[in-house]
């Protein structure tokens, strides 16, 4: 998921201006912006003789709409876990065969099963690329200065208006991802974060409406604000929340997976239904799932590899933290987003936009 706008990530990758005709000498990948290691394209061409062409997006809804529209020309796409069920039901992606993807054998089956339990219709249609969580990044000194008894490991830190009001002056941002934020509010209330109940959803929006006046921005790009020290609290993806520690070696910001429950998200490989070269799709997936490539991807994105790569962050500050490694004792408080229908998602989107404009 997740956004890190770094020009170097594109330097060795051909940019795609629009849908393209099939070309056996190239493979077309659709992915989050800044979400592959900079040397991926060069290494892929060296290994296969094929040129990697990249098209990127900045929001999960953008990718979902693009794949639903068909006619993309993509051989492979990386999409957010919560969108896959809808893509399957719409016939926008095709099943994946494993015979041409031997590196898939090393995928973390425990995490994959958690995902399939939440989205059973995705089975056979996807493979995980990278994992992460949605939690709270906070400037410990700034928060404790304003809230000496702050509940640093709880969603109450941001969802209790008494706390949010005292942190507003130093800056609160919330990731612009309605399904994730509603689930977090449900967890804070002690409700099922996967609930579809209208009453529960209403209660979650009640929590969000109460703190909205204290929120500086709802934004998918929180990376620069955190690295630049512009906010003191962010409900954010771990890829952004861990950036100050993993990339700058500073402990100014801490990243918490709240005790009430934390969303585990995945960015997953899917093959568009109109992909023209299925052999190329499998070839690129297998290449990107190779342990050395996954180690590079995990380091570059601050995400969690979908395959076992103990060397991914060996010896690097912060890579042994629970949020960066997800050891067994950290997995007990994880949940995944449910697979909502298109109609359910549209209702959430409408409420979310009204919330953001103060209605």
Residue ranges and their predicted role:
Residues 23-90:
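Early extracytoplasmic/lumenal segment of secretory-pathway proteins
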Residues 74-79, 232-237, 254:
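Paired acidic/hydrophobic, glycine-rich loop segments that form the ligand-binding mouth/hinge
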Residues 83-86, 233-251:
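A ligand-binding cleft/hinge motif common to bilobed small-molecule-binding domains
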Residues 84, 88-213, 221:
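Extracytoplasmic ligand-binding site segments that recognize negatively charged/polar headgroups
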Residues 137-142, 187, 265-277, 296:
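A bilobed periplasmic-binding-protein/Venus flytrap-type ligand-binding module shared by bacterial periplasmic
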Residues 201-210, 248-273:
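Periplasmic-binding protein-like
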Residues 272-333:
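Mature extracytoplasmic/periplasmic domains
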Residues 328-359:
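Conserved C-terminal helix/tail region of periplasmic/extracytoplasmic solute-binding proteins
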């Amino acid at each position: 998921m997740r956004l890190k706008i770094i020009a170097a990530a594109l330097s060795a990758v051909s940019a795609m201006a629009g849908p393209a005709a099939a070309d056996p000498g190239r493979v077309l990948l659709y992915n989050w912006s800044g979400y592959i290691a900079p040397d991926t394209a060069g290494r892929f061409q060296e290994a296969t003789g094929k040129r990697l062409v990249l098209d990127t997006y900045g929001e999960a809804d953008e990718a979902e709409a693009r794949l639903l529209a068909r006619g993309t020309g993509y051989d492979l796409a990386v999409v957010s876990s919560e969108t896959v069920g809808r893509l399957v039901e719409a016939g926008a992606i095709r099943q994946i065969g494993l015979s041409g993807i031997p590196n898939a054998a090393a995928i973390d089956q425990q995490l994959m099963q958690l995902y399939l339990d939440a989205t059973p219709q995705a089975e056979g249609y996807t493979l995980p690329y990278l994992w992460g969580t949605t939690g709270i990044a906070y400037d410990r000194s700034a928060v404790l200065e304003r809230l000496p008894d702050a509940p640093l490991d709880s969603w109450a830190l941001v969802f209790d208006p008494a706390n949010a009001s005292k942190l507003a002056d130093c800056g609160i941002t919330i990731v612009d991802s309605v399904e994730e934020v509603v689930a977090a509010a449900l967890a804070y209330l002690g409700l099922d974060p996967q609930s579809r109940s209208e009453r529960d959803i209403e209660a979650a929006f009640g929590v969000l409406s109460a703190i909205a006046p204290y929120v500086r921005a709802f934004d998918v790009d929180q990376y620069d604000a955190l690295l630049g020290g512009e906010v003191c609290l962010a409900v954010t993806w771990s890829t952004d929340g861990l950036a100050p520690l993993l990339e700058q070696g500073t402990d100014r910001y801490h990243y918490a997976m709240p005790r009430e429950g934390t969303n585990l998200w995945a960015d997953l490989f899917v093959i568009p239904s109109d992909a023209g070269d299925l052999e190329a799709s499998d070839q690129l997936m297998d290449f990107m799932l190779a342990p050395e490539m996954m180690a590079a991807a995990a380091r570059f994105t601050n995400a969690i590899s979908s395959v076992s790569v103990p060397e991914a962050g060996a010896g690097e500050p912060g890579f042994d933290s629970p949020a960066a490694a997800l050891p067994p004792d950290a997995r007990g408080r994880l949940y995944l987003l449910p697979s909502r229908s298109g109609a359910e998602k549209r209702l959430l989107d409408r409420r979310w936009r009204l919330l953001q404009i103060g209605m």
